[in-house]
């Protein structure tokens, strides 16, 4: 069974220590509820990942674990076969002992767009909301974060993360907890909070912004990346049914509307640092994720539209600072 005890020990004397009042019970409940399904099978695969410490790691320019020379060809093939049991791999890429995990998303491209605009992560305590299998968490660690905590309720993402962590060495201060943000108490403790690719999946985007705010210390930085559309501060797209074949997309605001929402939620220093239309090269099917991908979600006659006729995915990155609430507006 995947254990979270090392995380409890690491935060016992940190700014996150008051989380220990609730967290063990919450995660204990999660473990009891996931005794069946695929989790036990994936945990058996994790237990087979008994490899020596890698001779090198790189989290600064990539997520690369091992030089590729430690394993024989046979050992390398065995490891690849084990890692493929965690398919589909969506966020990456990873290179593990010379094995290229070619994920659906080129998450490294997103990181290159984002990292140049954010406050330096050196010595910061970071929260990554909706972290997937944790690719960006490793890059945050590579940029000097003191501790990175990711939350995502998916058991598969947890097991993919655990696989990478066990191969990288468990000593790294990076942890994934299988939780949604609604299960977090207001911690007011993180220096930087990331929410990338989450807001449009929330039925109440304003509530999500307040939940993110509740995790930041005063003066902490929010890095928000989400789908947007063109328009003024009153423009918001609410798909009638599906968007890009997804039935869990609720609100796509314009950049101006999103910045207004953040202002209303008592964020300051709000600025849009990047707007980028998702390319077919950034999100695509691979042998590690052989299912449908972006090309299947777009109009085959016009890739500027989704298959439903909405504007094709365009993503904006907004950075903002947690400010004292304006009680005159409450």
Curated annotation (Swiss-Prot):
GO terms for biological process: tRNA wobble uridine modification. It catalyses: carboxy-S-adenosyl-L-methionine + 5-hydroxyuridine(34) in tRNA = 5-carboxymethoxyuridine(34) in tRNA + S-adenosyl-L-homocysteine + H(+). InterPro entries: CmoB, Mo5U34_MeTrfas-like, SAM-dependent_MTases_sf. Carboxy-S-adenosyl-L-methionine binds at residues 91, 105, 110, 130, 152-154, 181-182, 196, 200, 315. Keywords: Transferase, tRNA processing. SUPFAM superfamilies: S-adenosyl-L-methionine-dependent methyltransferases. One of its GO terms (molecular function) is methyltransferase activity. Pfam families: Methyltransf_9 (PF08003). Its EC number is 2.5.1.-. Homotetramer. Belongs to the class I-like SAM-binding methyltransferase superfamily. CmoB family. Catalyzes carboxymethyl transfer from carboxy-S-adenosyl-L-methionine (Cx-SAM) to 5-hydroxyuridine (ho5U) to form 5-carboxymethoxyuridine (cmo5U) at position 34 in tRNAs. NCBIfam families: PRK15068.1 (NF011650), tRNA 5-methoxyuridine(34)/uridine 5-oxyacetic acid(34) synthase CmoB (TIGR00452). This is tRNA U34 carboxymethyltransferase. It comes from Shewanella denitrificans (strain OS217 / ATCC BAA-1090 / DSM 15013).
């Amino acid at each position: 069974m995947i254990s979270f005890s090392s995380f409890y020990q690491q935060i016992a004397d940190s700014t996150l220590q008051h989380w220990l009042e609730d967290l063990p019970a919450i995660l204990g409940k999660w473990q009891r509820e996931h005794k069946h399904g695929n989790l036990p099978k994936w945990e058996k695969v994790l237990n087979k990942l008994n490899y020596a410490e890698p001779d090198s790691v790189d989290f600064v320019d990539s997520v690369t674990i091992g030089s590729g020379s430690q394993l024989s060809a046979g050992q390398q093939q065995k490891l690849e076969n084990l890692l493929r049991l965690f398919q589909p791999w969506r966020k990456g890429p990873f290179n593990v002992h010379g094995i290229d995990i070619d994920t659906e998303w080129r998450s490294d491209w997103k990181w290159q767009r984002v990292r140049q605009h954010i406050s330096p992560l050196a010595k910061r305590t970071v929260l990554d909301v909706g972290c997937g299998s944790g690719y960006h968490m490793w890059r945050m660690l590579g940029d000097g974060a003191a501790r990175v905590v990711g939350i995502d309720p998916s058991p598969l993402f947890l097991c993919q993360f655990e696989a990478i962590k066990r191969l990288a060495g468990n000593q790294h201060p990076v942890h994934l907890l299988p939780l949604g943000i609604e299960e977090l108490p207001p911690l007011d403790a993180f220096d930087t909070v990331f929410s990338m690719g989450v807001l449009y999946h929330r039925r109440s985007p304003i509530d999500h912004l307040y939940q993110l705010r509740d995790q930041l210390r005063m003066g902490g930085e929010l890095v928000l990346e989400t789908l947007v559309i063109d328009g003024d501060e009153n423009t918001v797209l609410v798909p009638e049914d599906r968007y890009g074949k997804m039935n869990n997309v609720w609100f796509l605001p314009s950049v101006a509307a999103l910045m207004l929402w953040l202002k209303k939620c008592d964020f300051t220093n709000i600025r849009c640092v990047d707007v980028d239309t998702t390319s077919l090269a950034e999100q695509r099917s691979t042998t590690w994720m052989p299912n449908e991908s972006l090309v299947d979600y777009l109009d085959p006659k016009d890739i500027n539209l989704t298959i439903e006729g909405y504007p094709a995915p365009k993503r904006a990155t907004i950075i903002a600072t947690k400010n004292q609430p304006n009680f005159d507006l409450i």
